[in-house]
């Protein structure tokens, strides 16, 4: 039986649509009152693990799941070994650098040397500023990073931005985009090497159907 790690939250519904097109129906995961963390497909050929987006690469890397769907932003932060197979082209949002509206910072190089930048994505933020040769202190936050500039703790933030509504409501604006993040299909490398046709059939079905998905 194929095991698939699906991300709970914003990516779940489209992830289920992707696998349904490939013949694996995990729609029971969308039942309003369900608290189950595992769901078997209707055809009984696969099961899904419902995990946090950030945990998908962990389950896939350690072999508890053969396949997974995860945001590109998570992959950029992770150092775990997974096979990166497909850009599924949904769940799109920008990883962005933002500052307070009333600041004088119009571009990254306007930020003062050694200023503080708040982010959940510390590896991504560090690599970005290193590439620009801008010395900054990255402050790791796990919650609402917008509070960094609001409270004066940080001059800027690096965070995911979808509609920009949260930034606007908190008096912040983007001054740069680091990259565009979408959902990605990943696999356990050993599963790819050892598995026979069933796993590869699922991957090929997803690859052939993703361009015609109306999601």
Swiss-Prot record:
SUPFAM superfamilies according to UniProt: Periplasmic binding protein-like II (SSF53850)
Catalytic activity: 1-(5-phospho-beta-D-ribosyl)-ATP + diphosphate = 5-phospho-alpha-D-ribose 1-diphosphate + ATP
Entry's Gene Ontology BP terms: L-histidine biosynthetic process
Subcellular location: Cytoplasm
GO MF entries: ATP binding; ATP phosphoribosyltransferase activity
InterPro entries: ATP_PRibTrfase_cat, ATP_PRibTrfase_CS, ATP_PRibTrfase_HisG, ATP_PRibTrfase_HisG_short
Gene Ontology CC entries for this record: cytoplasm
Keywords: Amino-acid biosynthesis, ATP-binding, Cytoplasm, Glycosyltransferase, Histidine biosynthesis, Nucleotide-binding, Transferase
UniProt pathway: Amino-acid biosynthesis; L-histidine biosynthesis; L-histidine from 5-phospho-alpha-D-ribose 1-diphosphate: step 1/9
EC number(s) from the headed UniProt entry: 2.4.2.17
Disulfide bridge positions per record: none
NCBIfam families reported for this sequence: hisG
Family recorded in the similarity comment: Belongs to the ATP phosphoribosyltransferase family. Short subfamily.
SUBUNIT field: Heteromultimer composed of HisG and HisZ subunits.
Role this protein plays: Catalyzes the condensation of ATP and 5-phosphoribose 1-diphosphate to form N'-(5'-phosphoribosyl)-ATP (PR-ATP). Has a crucial role in the pathway because the rate of histidine biosynthesis seems to be controlled primarily by regulation of HisG enzymatic activity.
Notes concerning its domains: Lacks the C-terminal regulatory region which is replaced by HisZ.
Protein name: ATP phosphoribosyltransferase
Source organism phylogeny: Bacteria, Bacillati, Cyanobacteriota, Cyanophyceae, Synechococcales
Protein encoded by which gene: hisG
